[in-house]
Every structure is written in C-alpha cells, then in structure tokens.
C-alpha cells in the first residue's frame, strides 16, 4: 500500500505532477510556515499589550496618588508629555458632574449642546476619534490649546456620556484613523472612577 501511495501523482501548477507524498510534505511545510508567522504575530501583540498594560498601570498608580484634582490633572498631563505628546485634557459634561460651587471646577465644563455637532461630525457612532480638528472644533474642546496638529479623543465612561478625554500632538499625522484605540479605551473607562474622588456625580 505504501508503494501504491508513493506512485500516485498529483497535478502541480509549476512542476506538472508531483507524488502524493511530495504534495503532502509541501502542504505540511506551508502549514508550518503559516503557523510560525501567526506565532510571531501573536508574540508581537503580546509584547505590545504588555507595554500598554504597564503604561496603564503606571498611570493608574500615579493618578491614585494625587493629593487633589489639580494634582491629578497635572500628573495626567505629565504622563502624556512623557510619551512625547503635547498634553492630555479632560472636559466634563455639567449635566453629569457637579462642577460649580463648592468644588469650583467650572473650567472642566463642556457644554453638551456645543459639543454635539463635533461629536456627530467626528465620532458618529464611535467612541473614539483620531485625527485633526479644525479651528472652530478646537475652540469647543480645547479653547486654550496652541499648535494642535492632531488629537486622540475618547468619550468618557462605559456609556460614553460623562465627558471627553483628549490627547494632543503637534504633529498633524501623529493620530490617524485606523490606529489602535485599546489604551485610549481603557483610560476612558478608568478616569471617571478616579474623578469621583474629587467631583460629585449628578
């Protein structure tokens, strides 16, 4: 039977015909090559995810150690600067947070009505936006920012209705659609709980 199997010829697009054994060996080699490529990709992803995990862990520890809201916002901004960004900002919807007296954090307030056209235009049904903002849009979310080339913007909270977190870069091509948003997503979920230490939810 073994000799009979070896004698079987299989059509081959380049070599005309090959033996069944050769054909199976070639398939096995190809399969191993695909597995090796997949394994390399998985390793790359694991290393990238580990990097994201440690960045997030460092940020969480730093923000948890803050002595005030201003200290927390400064630590958040510094963390972004350490990553080579221009900065990081938070804007909160006043119908979800008590931003007036006595806490007096009105500078964080973002009118939902003012933000809505930008949200529809840039985010649509998505929770994150990566790319440029035009002048009027920047005035809505980052009125004091200068030389912003591109932003990574994410809606805060699991229901995406508490406010916005923004990372800014002076480089217009730094943030682009199609880039990964895993770290952004985790930060947007983590921040509201940390903010509740200093600001009461409505």
Regions found by a protein language model. Give the residues of each.
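Short hydrophobic/glycine-rich mini-motifs in sensory/regulatory modules
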Residues: 156-166, 171
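Signal-transducing coupling segments at domain and membrane junctions
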Residues: 126-150
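Helix-loop-beta substructure at the N-terminus of cytosolic sensory domains
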Residues: 65-106
């Amino acid at each position: 039977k073994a000799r009979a199997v070896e004698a079987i010829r299989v059509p081959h697009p380049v070599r005309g015909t090959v033996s069944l054994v050769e054909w199976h060996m070639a398939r096995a080699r190809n399969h191993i090559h695909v597995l090796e490529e997949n394994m390399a990709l998985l390793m790359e992803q694991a290393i990238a995810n580990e990097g994201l995990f440690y960045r997030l862990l460092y940020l969480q520890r730093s923000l948890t150690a803050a002595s005030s809201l201003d200290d927390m916002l400064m630590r958040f901004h510094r963390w972004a600067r350490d990553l080579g960004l221009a900065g990081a900002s938070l804007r909160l919807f006043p119908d979800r947070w008590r931003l007036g007296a006595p806490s007096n954090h009105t500078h964080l307030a973002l009118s939902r009505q003012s933000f809505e056209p930008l949200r529809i235009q840039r985010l649509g049904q998505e929770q994150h936006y990566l790319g440029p903002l035009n002048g009027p849009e920047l005035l809505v979310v980052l009125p004091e920012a200068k030389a912003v080339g591109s932003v990574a913007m994410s809606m805060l909270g699991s229901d995406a209705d508490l406010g916005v977190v923004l990372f800014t870069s002076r480089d217009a091509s730094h943030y682009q659609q199609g880039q990964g948003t895993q770290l952004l997503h985790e930060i947007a979920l983590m921040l509201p709980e940390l903010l509740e230490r200093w600001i009461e939810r409505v």
